[in-house]
Amino acid sequence: MMRPILIGITGGTGSGKSTVANEIYESFKDDCIAIIEQDSYYKDQSHLTFEDRIKTNYDHPNAFDTELLVEHLKELSKGNTINKPIYDFKEHTRKKEVVEVKAKDIIIVEGIMILQDVELRNLLDIKIYVDTDDDVRIIRRILRDIKERGRTIDSVVDQYLGVVKPMHSQFIEPTKKYADIIIPEGGQNKVAIDIMVSKIKQILSENK
C-alpha cells in the first residue's frame, strides 16, 4: 500500500469543515478514504468531577490530545490500524468504546486546531482553511449544540461570546497563513471542492 495522502481541513466553529470533508469523502469509494475528526481527540476527563468537566475550554489547543492524534496519523501513514477515541459531549469526557480505523489511500483530518500544532501541521500533504462569515458560523454553532449536544441557547451564546470568539481570533484565524488553499463559504463552494477533488485524484494517480 502506498503512503496515504493526509489532508487537513480547518476553520472556525460552524465554518463548514465537516461539510467540505464529507463532500470530498463522497467523491471517492469508501474503501479508499477515511475521515478523522479532531473532536474525537479531546482529552479524557474521567478523572475530574462533572462540575469541573463542564468548565473545559474546548476552543483552546490544550483541550486536545494532539500527541495521540499525531501518533495515530503516523500509524495510519505506515499502513497500520488505529483505535480512534469517541468523545461524549454530554458527559464531557471520552467514552470507553473506540472506533477501529484502517489505513486508506486518503485520510482527511478535520477540526478547528488542525494547523495550530507544528508537528501535526507538518504531517499534512494538503492544508485547507474553510473561511466563513462570523454571523453564519454562530448560527450554525447554536443549532448544532442545541440539537446534538443537549445545550441551551443561552449557554451556547454565552460560550460563543466569552470563549469561542476570542479563541478563534487568538488561535484559529492566524493559522490561515499555513493553508495551501482557502475555501470561502465552505460546503457551498462547489467549484473549490471540485478543484480539490481533481487535485487529490491527480496525486493518487501519480503515486500509483
From Swiss-Prot:
Organism: Clostridium novyi (strain NT)
Coiled coil (residue ranges): none
Name assigned to this protein: Uridine kinase
Similarity-based family: Belongs to the uridine kinase family.
One Pfam family matching this protein: PRK
Gene field: udk
Principal EC category: transferase
Membrane spanning residue stretches: none
Subcellular location per the Swiss-Prot or TrEMBL entry: Cytoplasm
Source organism, top-level taxon: Bacteria
InterPro entries given in the database record: P-loop_NTPase, PRK/URK, Uridine_kinase, Uridine_kinase-like
Pathway(s) the chain acts in: Pyrimidine metabolism; CTP biosynthesis via salvage pathway; CTP from cytidine: step 1/3; Pyrimidine metabolism; UMP biosynthesis via salvage pathway; UMP from uridine: step 1/1
Molecular function GO terms recorded: ATP binding; cytidine kinase activity; uridine kinase activity
GO cellular component: cytoplasm
